[in-house]
């Protein structure tokens, strides 16, 4: 497995194109999210030139996982789309808190059989660790993410220091929460 972390301009056009297609396959086709994006490319308003990414590839250079990192000093998913998850707590806006979003570790050539396998897989752990390392190098002390409630237990079981930033809420039928992960 090869994991690359960097800003959009650090990725070749070929890798960035494969990355956009991978996200489309995961979030639109596999998870069924209704997103306003062109066919076979998933990007949103938070994907900009200064957005950071983590991309995992297998030995055949197929993408098997990814994550997006944004400092909370600029618009970010939790702050713009899901602020209710903070239950009235002020939105983080600090160079020391980065948002982790669009996290996936789906290997379409070898898919997991359960949701817990997908979140606790070695690829998931490696992507999260690389995201933490990259964010730390940028000055972050915490990551914040919008996550399904089951992720909290899996993060702790994997040894990450994670806690709730607000109470869980049901959004579109899913129990979600804002999660802080210490870097």
From Swiss-Prot:
One of its GO terms (biological process) is quorum sensing. Pfam families: Autoind_synth. GO terms for molecular function: N-acyl homoserine lactone synthase activity. The keyword Transferase applies. It comes from the Bacteria. InterPro entries: Acyl_CoA_acyltransferase, Autoind_synthase. Its EC number is 2.3.1.184. Keywords: Autoinducer synthesis, Quorum sensing, S-adenosyl-L-methionine, Transferase. Disruption phenotype: Deletion mutant does not produce OH-dDHL. Belongs to the autoinducer synthase family. Involved in the synthesis of the acyl-homoserine lactone (AHL) signal N-(3-hydroxydodecanoyl)-L-HSL (3-hydroxy-C(12)-HSL or OH-dDHL). Probably part of a quorum-sensing system with AnoR. This is Acyl-homoserine-lactone synthase. The gene is anoI.
